[in-house]
Design a protein with these regions (language model features):
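Charge-rich, low-complexity N-terminal segments
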Residues: 1-47, 51-119
Length: 119
């Protein structure tokens, strides 16, 4: 269970990371929407797992490669934004959040019709 401090830091990081990725998408990936779907900080506040979703979905792999290569630059940009709220910036791990793709697949299956497996 997350502490109140973890929840506050998750929220702070998510808001600021969204701004960082908005600028990054405009500069490096025009026409691509990068969304910070969630951030989970460990109890010791040393590691933050950042879950990103991309639209269009076919640009996910290329964008994730770019983000992994430029992780120090992204962390530095984040540190500049939250330097007055956090003493130490957690290490950041990036993961592609495929929940949008999963939802799109479910929508497609429902639209196609077919037999309902739940009766």
């Amino acid at each position: 269970m997350e502490s109140i401090r973890q929840k506050r830091i998750n929220s702070l990081l998510q808001h600021n990371m969204a701004e960082v990725f908005q600028a990054l998408a405009a500069a490096e990936f025009p026409g691509t929407l990068i969304t910070v779907s969630k951030i989970r900080v460990t109890p010791d506040l040393g590691l933050a797992r950042v879950y990103l979703s991309f639209f269009p979905i076919d640009r996910t792999e290329k964008a994730m490669e770019f983000i992994q290569e430029h992780a120090p630059r992204i962390k530095n940009e984040l540190a500049g934004r939250v330097r007055h709220q956090l003493r130490v910036i957690p290490n950041l791990q990036y993961f592609a959040d495929d929940s949008m793709e999963y939802e799109a697949n479910i929508e497609r299956l429902l639209r196609e019709g077919g037999e309902n497996p739940i009766k």
